[in-house]
Amino acid sequence: MNEPLLLFRGIEKTYAETNILRNVDISLYPGKCILLSGNNGSGKTTLLKIIAGLETPSRAEIELSGKSHSWKSAIRSIRREIIYLHQQPYLLSGTVESNVSYGLRFTHLNRKQLRESVKEALEWAGLADVAKHQAKTLSGGVQQRVAFTRAWILKPKVLLLDEPMANMDIESRQQACDLLKRMKSEGMSIVITSHDMNIFDGLIDSHCSLSDGKLD
């Protein structure tokens, strides 16, 4: 197996003296997808947010290039390489095209390069025919694909998805899985939380379960 992109070790999180996460280790590999399951309140979302740098752990270390660093000192250098997506797409008001282009507006790309990148992304995701549609008027499955594409265009190394297939019909799930498989084939590391691993046709490489704050 390839060297891991990131190793998170000894993750702990305590809320009001309750141990939500207890000494959790997780390794993220390029081109691999982890399914993270567990009951509601087991800490799945908390773990994803700690990996993404959106929530501070009580304790954690990150291993980079064979050296261990505290979470606080290391997360700043890797935060831009990680994208976390909530169960809800949280699209902006405006067209599909403007949603997909949003993150690129804060990069060095000029207008021509931005337009070309957005066009490529929309074609890649099979969204070119709805590019000018108002994003929030589309079905939930299409909105989620827009959110995936908005993430993909920024070329993160790690994509964290919190219950991404909730409330999708079978066809929408298959289309979303197809996009995620393509991301994985390009070397992206993906972590998905879900209660049902049977809906991720051929996508999952490994399965971990959170219970009593520990990862099995």
Indicate where each model-derived feature is located.
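ABC ATPase NBD Q-loop/coupling interface
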Residues: E61-S77
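H-loop/switch region of ABC-family ATPase nucleotide-binding domains
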Residues: S194-H195
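Conserved ABC ATPase signature
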Residues: Q134-L138, V142
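ABC-family nucleotide-binding domains
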Residues: D169
